[in-house]
Amino acid sequence: MEEPLAPPQSVLDAFNIHHSLEPLSGGRGLCFFAGDVILRPVDEATEAEWLGDLLLKLSNLSNPEYRVSRPLLLETASLSPPHRFIENDWTASFFLPGKDGPKNKWSQLFDASRAFHRDLKELVPEPPAFIGSRTHRWAQADRITWEEQRLEDTPDVNHSVLERISGYLARLGRFKKPLSKDTLACQLIHADLTGNVLFDVEDQDLSPAIIDLSLYWRPVEFAEAVVVADGIICFGEGPELIHLFGTDGIRLQILVRALYWRILTFAIQSDLPWLEAHLPRMDFDRAVRLVSECFASTC
């Protein structure tokens, strides 16, 4: 395995960082520690710059119900865009202590999510421009799930993987019913909370930390529905977690879409070595069956 490419000295100077670099586990193996700062490579500069501004605003709110990582401004940053948070395709933000793993902490995760999304709704009244232009597999699967893009028109579909998951998608598709846009208000959401909420492990009375924002413009319930989907697919959770989320007709429809989205992502721009290592651990069949039972009995 190749060593990750470290940020050059010019990046450390730009953020006024004077500590040695250490590779950080997680973050796709691409990030580095420097003292109490994490340096992260940028995938898309426009989105990363926008996100830096959002995280700065969220940090300034100091909401006691959750924490976010405060981004570092460039030493040469002006008070206006476009170059406040990125240097040579790297960003920097302060490290947040905590441990991931939502097992037995689902209620805490939901409470933090709801406080976080209330603030997002206030800070971001309109969808950012980059939301509709992204082409990575999660964005494409999202548009297919919400019937804004057709699967057959989607590039980079791995048809071998799609064949393996098509039965689950078909079963979920039978439960999908149209959702009126008048019923569901969309807003900015974090759609990958499950492994990206850090919890206090040393009795420091720390609120949950929300990291690695994965942003979409969807109903706020979708953020929690993805957590439920992950809980039953990856963590062996059962009907209790579905009950915690809610089992009214609208929430079940959103949960169906969350499961559909999560499963579909594996068939687009597929990373085959990763899939072969992880797909056997994903209990799609049980997840779809649990949701089917909810529709049969309204849980």
Regions flagged by a language model, labelled:
Residues 3-33:
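ATP-binding glycine-rich phosphate-binding loop
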Residues 91-99:
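Short pocket-lining segment of the protein kinase catalytic domain that shapes the ATP-binding cleft
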Residues 3-7, 153-186:
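Short, conserved active-site entrance elements at the starts or edges of catalytic domains
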Residues 5, 40-88, 100-118:
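A conserved alpha-helical element in kinase catalytic cores
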Residues 200-251:
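Active-site Asp-x-Gly
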Residues 27-34, 38-39, 71, 169-220:
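Active-site acidic catalytic loop and adjacent metal/ATP-binding pocket
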Residues 151, 226-227, 240-299:
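Helix-rich C-terminal or lid/interface subdomains of diverse kinases
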Residues 100-161:
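A cross-family kinase active-site recognition segment
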